[in-house]
């Protein structure tokens, strides 16, 4: 009996535990949330460890309203009621790691649009739309390419999982972005203007590297080629328009890098752009007056190269200004847009050039006749400058697509094999050729001798015609000869360090006798 009475007395004397819902809080700065309190006997008292929030307690003790201040961190709210019952509420105040856009529309062009290209564009589009705070890490799940190309006038849907890791500083965010891809039917276009940007080649400070204006009447191509100096920085390509009219642009682009292997970057860019341009694969974006569109925003480490080619067509509104920027880590590209152009390095590999019709060539070869040859990338002819008084030049035809109408004729009574070859004249060079929709490339070659690109087997009495497209690879030395011959050329590029390779290894001297 005494034990029972003692238990009752102890139960009455021991304070109870309050029930809270939710049992912990995660708040953004200035965010407010109501917390329900069960089992409290008024009055309810509240104290805080750090005062990262403010607390308003209801008179009946059934709830508290917690409001975060602008400070971030962790706090604990201690509640005690009139009977001594207690509860602790852990609180964390932080910003969300970023913002995931739930749905969007991506307008593309392509005749048709290749599945792998589409998947890459969707990934890039979602990456660009996903905004993360400094120090947070964005992870875009791999996008599965569609089972078939996307024809003009059709659409496709993609659901892309996105994760933003707050790295302990922010609240992690996870979700999906639904992308409706629409393939807009547009006629292909060829720019008549080339913006050539390779001066200064090495990035040593922040600022504007190149600035050019594109109008609806004259599409333009931007070719940029830069490597980083000593400090990590970004290469940014921004498109802006001050027009009050809605401005829409079509962008057909490819890029390569960052990579320290400059010749690999140059050839990768050529191959990617030739294929992309042939399929008319691009994106259509709308520009706003108050926000630049970042076509490229590429982090670079010391000595890494980034290069790109983009054809720009203004579909409505405009004009559009294309600006290439060197931006140190942490700097806002928008603060540099209106600055002066950085001093050049003295090579004058920059400027605006007329390329309408430039690079249109023909090769005609008849079996049994002399070789047919064409020199590309020489100092004469070279794309003429828009401003004849400007010091810039484009020796090497960088950024120019050479389109070669090839005609082969075999009038004889026996089959015949003709060889397409590439012959460097100025030093190490690589080359890529788009022939009948397929890419053929030549590895790094240096010695001025013909190297085989491909061969053509001609039946007796037959004629063959096709169109070949090629571009000067960045980091390659031009001019070079493109030719057709009956004599089998060297079948492939030698090893890089071979005596006839691009960068021969010094030969050891023979031991003295």
Tell me what each language-model feature is:
Residues 62-74, 143-152:
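Extracellular/luminal low-complexity segments enriched in Ser/Thr/Pro
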Residues 90-97, 176-184:
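Short beta-strand edge segments in extracellular beta-sheet folds
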């Amino acid at each position: 009996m005494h034990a029972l009475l003692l238990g009752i007395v102890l139960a009455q004397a021991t304070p109870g535990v309050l029930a809270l819902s939710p049992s912990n809080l995660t708040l953004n700065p200035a965010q407010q949330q109501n917390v329900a309190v069960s089992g409290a006997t008024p009055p309810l008292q509240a104290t805080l460890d750090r005062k990262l929030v403010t607390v308003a307690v209801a008179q009946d003790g059934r709830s508290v309203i917690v409001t975060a201040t602008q400070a971030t961190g962790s706090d604990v709210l201690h509640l005690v009621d009139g009977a001594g019952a207690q509860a602790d509420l852990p609180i964390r105040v932080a910003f969300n790691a970023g913002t995931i856009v739930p749905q969007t529309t991506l307008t593309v062009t392509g005749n048709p649009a290749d599945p792998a290209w589409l998947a890459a564009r969707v990934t890039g589009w979602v990456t660009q739309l996903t905004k993360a705070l400094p120090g947070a890490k964005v992870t875009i799940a791999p996008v599965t390419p569609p089972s078939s190309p996307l024809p003009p006038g059709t659409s496709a849907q993609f659901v892309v999982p996105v994760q933003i890791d707050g790295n302990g500083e922010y609240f992690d965010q996870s979700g999906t972005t639904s992308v409706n891809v629409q393939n807009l039917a547009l006629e292909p276009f060829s720019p008549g203007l080339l913006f050539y940007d390779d001066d200064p080649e090495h990035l040593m400070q922040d600022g504007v590297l190149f600035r050019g204006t594109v109008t609806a009447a004259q599409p333009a191509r931007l070719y940029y080629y830069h490597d980083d100096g000593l400090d990590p920085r970004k290469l940014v390509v921004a498109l802006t328009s001050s027009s009050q009219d809605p401005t829409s642009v079509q962008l057909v682009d490819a890029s390569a890098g960052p990579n320290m292997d400059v010749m690999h970057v140059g050839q990768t860019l050529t191959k990617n752009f030739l294929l992309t341009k042939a399929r008319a694969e691009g994106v259509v974006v709308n520009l706003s007056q108050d926000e630049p569109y970042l076509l490229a925003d590429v982090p670079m480490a010391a000595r890494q190269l980034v290069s790109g080619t983009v054809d720009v067509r203004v579909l409505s509104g405009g004009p559009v200004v294309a600006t290439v920027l060197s931006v140190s880590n942490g700097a806002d590209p928008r603060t540099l847009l209106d600055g002066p152009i950085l001093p050049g390095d003295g090579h004058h590999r920059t400027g605006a050039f007329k390329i309408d019709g430039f690079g249109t060539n023909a090769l005609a070869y008849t079996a049994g006749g002399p070789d047919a040859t064409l020199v590309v990338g020489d100092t004469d002819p070279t794309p003429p400058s828009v401003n004849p008084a400007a010091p810039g030049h484009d020796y090497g035809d960088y950024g120019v697509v050479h389109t070669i109408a090839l005609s082969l004729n075999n009038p004889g009574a026996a089959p015949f094999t003709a060889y397409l070859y590439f012959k460097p004249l100025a030093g190490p060079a690589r080359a890529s050729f788009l022939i009948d929709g397929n890419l053929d490339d030549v590895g790094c070659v240096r010695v001025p001798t013909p190297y085989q690109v491909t061969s053509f087997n001609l039946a007796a009495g037959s004629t063959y015609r096709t169109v070949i497209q090629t571009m000067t690879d960045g980091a390659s030395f031009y001019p070079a000869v493109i030719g057709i011959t009956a004599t089998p050329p060297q079948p492939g590029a030698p090893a890089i360090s071979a005596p006839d390779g691009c960068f021969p290894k010094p030969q050891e001297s023979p031991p003295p006798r």
